[in-house]
Amino acid sequence: KMSSDIFVIYQIDNSEKNREYRCRSYEYQIQHGFMITADNYGTGYSGTATRGMGAEAIRKKMESINPDKFKIRKFGVSDVIGLTEAGKTSFFYVDKDRLVRFNGFFPKSQSGTYLILDEGGYQVAGQKGTWLVSDEVEVDGQRFVQMRSEQTKNPPPSIILHESGAFVTQTALGFDGEAIRKMRAFLQGPKPELLHHQKFFENGTAERAKESGTEQ
């Protein structure tokens, strides 16, 4: 028996704040700073596909099945296909005439690496457009990455993020002395929420802080 690929259809949730972003194009979301992340989506459908079937074929199949099968709304533009092939999950945004492969749907992937070197299509909260991971460095045992804007016309300066996805600083000169100083200050400062959750996982405590109330 051939092993199958697993796929999940994520759909923008029914919250009032996300109403105007439903059924919009990828470009619209990027321009308006709507974060295409699990925070704004719920699971609409999940299933298995013949190995190697691919996202395009899954899209066709989803377009042909009964709309009532979806938990949130009929399948269509603004949905996300999460396809796991041989243990690796890729995410595709359903646009009108294409599928856009992008990164960063889950804040931190199960494998532990969220910001993958030389991968693009990441959105960064509070920053316009999409970003590519262009460099990485370790400071005091913590990983930081440099992100380059994928905007071709007048791109904004590069930025440095902590591996948790937290913003550290803008940089014109990559990991220079000034940037390293800011990374150290970041590590000394109050820890962002994400790190707070990671601490619990590291301690192996069942306690999941505030997050537990909001789990899908």
Residue ranges and their predicted role:
Residues 37-83:
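Short, conserved turn/kink motifs that form compact alpha/beta structural patches or helix kinks used as
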Residues 28-32, 56-64, 178-188, 207:
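Polar/charged alpha-helical tracts
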Residues 2-50:
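Extended boundary segments
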Residues 74-106:
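Short, compact, well-ordered microdomains
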Residues 20-34, 92-96, 160-161, 168-176, ...:
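Short amphipathic beta-strand/extended segments with alternating polar/hydrophobic composition
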Residues 2, 10-16, 81-88, 147-156, ...:
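Short, flexible beta-strand-to-coil junctions
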Residues 105-216:
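Extended intrinsically disordered terminal tails
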Residues 12-14, 53, 68-70, 77, ...:
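Charged, low-complexity intrinsically disordered segments
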